Each structure stands twice: as structure tokens, then as C-alpha cells.
């Protein structure tokens, strides 16, 4: 399972002209699910993301988590995180999970984030989405449950 985590001052997802999820201060999480992923990867990433100390404290040091600052999470499914462009110029998505399994694990990840007491807004799985954000910093962290980067 792969994520791109961005610290934001606000973010939203629009599907077919309607906002499906929006947050103010918090984290935008783009989530990709791989073929071999299981619930344990979702649990690991939810724990890691909820505890990431990437918000500044009173001394302007990154020392606070999204929980500490009372922020929220906007989780957006993004299978293209498994795009492989090592051969040719068109990405291959063979390493991405099948849509049915990916949806299960995406929803499980969202449930795990919510179980940590965080408000978690979402996009719409498999929909064409327009993601709008104001990146705060910018601060962007890449996480992979298989620790590949």
C-alpha cells in the first residue's frame, strides 16, 4: 500500500460538480492499494499517518501530529500510485490491486483512521475526481507499507 501524505491548510474533492469531501487544516492522503496488500498494511499506514509529527509546535519545530492539532484527513483512492514506467512511456498498473479488493482495503483504511478519533472525509472510489488543495509548507511525505522508499 502506498500513500502520498500532504500537510494542507485546506483540501477538497469534487465529483460531477459536487464536493464529496472537504477539510480545513489536516492531511490529504492519496492512497494506492497493491495486489499483495492486506488489512495489516492499512492498519500500519493508518497508525503511521495518525502519528506523523509533521505539524509545527510553538517553537516552529515539526513535533505535532494531525491528532495533536485537531486536524482532519481527506483520503482519496489513487491506483496510479502503482504506475510502473520503467518500460516505455505509458504506465503499467499491473501491480495495483483489482478494484473490488482495492475498494475493500481503502474503506478499511478510512475506518482505521476514524477509529483513531480523526474526522476522515473521502473521495468517491473509482470516480473521476478533482482534488483541490492548499499545501502547507509544502510538506509531502511518501509512505509505503512494504518500505520500498
Swiss-Prot record:
Q: Where in the cell is it found?
A: Cytoplasm
Q: Which InterPro entries match?
A: Daa-tRNA_deacyls_DTD, DTD-like_sf
| Single Gene Ontology MF annotation | D-tyrosyl-tRNA(Tyr) deacylase activity
CC annotations in GO: cytoplasm
Catalyzed reactions per annotation: glycyl-tRNA(Ala) + H2O = tRNA(Ala) + glycine + H(+); a D-aminoacyl-tRNA + H2O = a tRNA + a D-alpha-amino acid + H(+)
Instruction: Indicate which residues form the motif Gly-cisPro motif, important for rejection of L-amino acids.
Output: 137-138
- Source superkingdom: Bacteria
Principal cellular location given in the protein's record: cytoplasm
Name the Enzyme Commission number(s) assigned to this protein: 3.1.1.96
Top class in the EC scheme: hydrolase
Question: What's this protein's function?
Answer: An aminoacyl-tRNA editing enzyme that deacylates mischarged D-aminoacyl-tRNAs. Also deacylates mischarged glycyl-tRNA(Ala), protecting cells against glycine mischarging by AlaRS. Acts via tRNA-based rather than protein-based catalysis; rejects L-amino acids rather than detecting D-amino acids in the active site. By recycling D-aminoacyl-tRNA to D-amino acids and free tRNA molecules, this enzyme counteracts the toxicity associated with the formation of D-aminoacyl-tRNA entities in vivo and helps enforce protein L-homochirality.
Q: Which family does it belong to?
A: Belongs to the DTD family.
Subunit structure, as described in the record: Homodimer.
Q: What is this protein called?
A: D-aminoacyl-tRNA deacylase
* Gene of this entry: dtd
Amino acid at each position: 500500500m502506498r500513500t502520498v501524505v500532504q500537510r494542507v491548510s485546506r483540501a477538497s474533492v469534487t465529483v460531477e460538480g459536487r464536493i464529496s469531501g472537504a477539510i480545513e487544516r489536516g492531511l490529504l492522503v492519496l492512497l494506492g492499494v497493491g495486489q499483495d496488500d492486506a488489512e495489516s498494511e492499512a492498519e500500519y499506514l493508518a497508525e503511521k499517518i495518525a502519528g506523523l509529527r509533521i505539524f509545527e509546535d510553538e517553537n516552529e519545530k515539526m513535533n505535532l501530529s494531525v491528532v495533536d492539532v485537531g486536524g482532519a484527513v481527506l483520503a482519496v483512492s489513487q491506483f496510479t500510485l502503482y504506475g510502473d514506467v520503467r518500460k516505455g512511456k505509458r504506465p503499467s498498473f499491473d501491480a495495483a490491486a483489482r478494484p473490488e479488493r482495492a475498494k475493500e482495503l481503502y474503506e478499511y483504511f478510512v475506518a482505521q483512521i476514524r477509529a483513531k478519533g480523526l474526522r476522515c472525509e473521502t473521495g468517491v472510489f473509482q470516480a473521476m475526481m478533482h482534488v483541490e488543495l492548499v499545501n502547507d509548507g509544502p510538506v509531502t511525505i511518501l509512505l509505503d507499507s512494504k518500505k520500498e522508499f
